[in-house]
Regions:
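Conserved ABC ATPase "signature" region
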Residues: 83, 125-143, 194-195
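Conserved ABC ATPase "signature" C-loop
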Residues: 226-227
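A short, proline-enriched helix->beta-strand linker immediately N-terminal to the Walker B motif
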Residues: 166-170
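Conserved ABC ATPase signature
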Residues: 147-151, 155
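ABC ATPase "signature
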Residues: 232-233, 241
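The feature captures the beta-strand-to-loop junction immediately N-terminal to the Walker
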Residues: 52-54
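Helix-to-loop junction immediately C-terminal to a conserved catalytic motif
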Residues: 67
């Protein structure tokens, strides 16, 4: 089954990969208070980048600026060299997967995957084919005509991911998509996301407060605290050389605790 996405010689990002998404000097203020402090970062083509931090660190505000739900007070965003700073969400070349699935409960699995394609008239003739293709790739072939209410939480999240993939976005943003799922389902979905990234070279930006999840999934991790970037590096580099005491305490120490807990779960 042919789908819209292709994997033409794309591979997960390496150190020499070109920049896909660039932020320069991003500042955001609410009621006069600055909550993002001149953020500078790049997301490389085909990489999996996690933005990691506790509640209130600015990661969700950053996500909302990336997708276009908020405008920065200062700074610029470019995607593939195109300035998207003030572009509306549907003209940014990005897709988003939410924590709460955001599915239409009165529709079937297939209907949910097809829904976003209804706003792409040039794809009208292939809408059903594209939706079915991505659903099959995510292991949902047996559930196409079921109501999404009949699915488990993990299956519903797969439908949400399939709906985003069907649009073939240049970048997929994930807003803590696994926080409501049990441990086994989360582990399974991690494998799915890494497979998608590997097979299609999809650029992914993943928002999370979970250290173990970020380090298991990511090519690089951007550690945020109080509206600033404390470190942006590969997981091994952060563990070996935390940039400051904040990174050492929030990431490294907590990661070791979580890894010990996961090991005990896997040994059951």
């Amino acid at each position: 089954m042919e789908v819209l996405m292709t994997n033409e010689s794309k591979a997960p990002a390496a150190g020499g990969a070109p920049k896909k998404l660039s932020a320069r000097g991003l500042v955001k203020r609410f009621d006069g208070k600055e909550v993002l402090h001149a953020l500078d970062f790049d997301v490389l083509d085909g990489e999996f980048l996690s933005i990691l931090g506790p509640s209130g660190c600015g990661k969700t505000t950053t996500l909302r600026i990336l997708i276009g739900l908020l405008m920065p007070d200062e700074g610029t965003l470019t995607l593939g060299g195109r300035d998207i700073t003030t572009a509306p969400p549907d003209d940014r070349g990005m897709g988003i997967v939410f924590q709460n699935y955001a599915l239409f409960e009165n529709m079937t699995v297939r209907g949910n995957a097809e829904y976003a394609l209804k706003f792409k008239p040039e794809l009208k003739a292939r809408r059903r084919e594209i939706a079915q293709g991505v659903l099959e790739q995510l292991g949902l072939a047996e559930h196409l005509d079921k109501s999404v209410r009949q699915l488990s939480g993990g299956q519903q999240q797969r439908v949400s991911i399939a709906r985003t993939l069907a649009l073939n976005p240049e970048v997929i943003l994930f807003d803590e998509p696994m926080s409501a799922l049990d441990v086994e389902t989360r582990l399974s979905l991690r494998l799915e996301l890494k497979r998608i990234q590997r097979e299609f070279g999809t650029t992914m930006v993943y928002i999370t407060h979970d250290q173990e999840e970020a380090f298991a999934l990511s090519d690089r991790v951007m550690v945020m605290g109080e509206g600033s970037i404390h470190q942006l590096a590969a997981p091994d580099e952060i563990i070996a050389n935390p940039a400051d005491d904040y990174v050492a305490d929030f990431v490294v120490k907590n990661l070791r605790i979580k890894m010990d807990s996961l090991a005990r779960f896997m040994d059951r």
